[in-house]
Amino acid sequence: MEQKIPELLKTVEQNFKIKILFAVEVGSRTWELNSTESDYDVRFVFYRSLEDYISVSKFEEQIDLGFDKDFNQIQREGAYIEMSGFDIFKYFKLLSSCNVTAIDWINSNIIYLGDNNKNELKTFIENNVNKPKIFIQYFCTARGCHKGYLGAKNELNVKKYLHVMQLILNAEYVLKFKKLPYSSMIKNLQELEKEIPKEIVEKINELINMKKSGHGKDITNEINVLDKYYVETFERFQNLHLDKKIREEKNMDINYLNKFMQKLIIKKEK
């Protein structure tokens, strides 16, 4: 796959007449929770020619593709290899607003294409991102996911409980260390283990073992000990009242992102 996915991405570049800035893996493989049944979730950022950007023709800001195990193109949903790409303008807008999806892409530890571009951007983000705002984004996303999952009790599974915990760990990591979390849930859990009740760590490790053995989508009843811990954690986060700290933090240097885009697109024309 380390060779095949970059080959597929090069074909995407040719078919859509785009240039991929960087491409990464997201999800369970980057969390180090993948099993033999895990699919591949590939995300990429692309840009077009200057001519395309100043054309009256409308080009899509997002490209979604799917491939089966034989690398035949199929619909994206449920595919063995799911690909989703954002145009650089869309992606940089999300990045500048501290969107956690955009942050997770730049923070991925599995890179298929454009490692130099990705690492340069990651260094910039680490030094310029509004850490309290990132914390709030992870916190609110975790709370929203937990509420949504509990609302669909007949669809509760191991993976969903781990997803909420992964977001909580990301928020806790930013709060404690004032920097971006690891993309690996395992590493974040190890770093924060002393901050978390022993019974919660044990339960999460139990779910991690289930996920890695291929039981991530197994339907489960409500796990009361985790639900209680999640709700209490959300209340603790809410009581931090970080709105003032968010305002006090410097805004991201948008000029850097603008120049980064301009350099790529204009250079491509020369």
Could you describe each region identified by the protein language model?
Residues 1-20, 24-37, 43-104:
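Metal-dependent nucleotidyltransferase catalytic core
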Residues 95, 168-175, 264, 268:
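Generic structural signal for hydrophobic core residues of well-folded globular domains
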Residues 74-77, 88, 107-109, 145-152:
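Short acidic (Asp/Glu) patches
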Residues 49-50, 96-99, 114-115, 157, ...:
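Alpha-helix initiation/capping motif
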Residues 84-131:
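Glycogenin-like
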Residues 116-249:
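Conserved nucleotidyltransferase catalytic core and NTase-mimicking acidic/glycine-rich helix/loop elements
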